[in-house]
Amino acid sequence: WNCPNCPDGTSILNNLKETYGERLVVSAVHQGSFAKPKAENNNLDLRTPYGDDLGSKFGLSSWPNAVINRKIGPLGRGDWETKIQECFANTEHLMNISLGAENTQQGLLVSLQVDALKDINEALTVTLFITESDIKGVQNNQGVMIEDYSFQHVLRNNPIVDMPLATTGLKDGDRVSKNYYFTLDKSLNLNNCAVVAFVSNSAGEVLQVNEIEVEN
């Protein structure tokens, strides 16, 4: 909230989403010194333990910053467009991910299906998490405080991280189906939430990603 350049970063991401549509999945991780809640922002705390872990893992020390596919970065906002273009041009289409989400008494049930399009000869894991949009709060915009800023794609609590998907890899045509339950934080507005799922290789790099909006 106290990152004066983050609204500009958001504008860049919005433009990239307009360009790439569903091919580009954005998740906003609030961490670091600018994210610490204070009275000035009504103590709104959008940090998560997983977000803090990601910040440490990728050595984030300035904001806004981005990591693409857990592989490229961290990058300042001036490099995002070029690097995303390069990523789409050079990344092999190895698999498709299909998702379903249903709110149940036990929590949010997410169904995941992975269809391999080529042979992948290494162990694969899957990570799933919830993002929430239209969270209202205070945001510093180049020194001007916006009182009713709308935060988008915010990483929320209780992710499911690096779960085994295929310990020996997949062959072209293989299909893997799994179900996962999320414990839901009562503060979530499910009408504004989405589930993000990505498959990673043994180096932790993202091979494919998808997201689905949650219907309450």
Regions found by a protein language model. Name each.
Residues 10-29:
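Conserved helix-turn-beta segment immediately C-terminal to the redox Cys motif
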Residues 28-216:
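Short, conserved sequence motifs used for protein processing/export or organelle targeting and
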Residues 2, 17-20, 70, 88:
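Sec/Tat-exported extracytoplasmic proteins
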Residues 1-12:
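Conserved redox-active cysteine motifs that mediate thiol-disulfide chemistry
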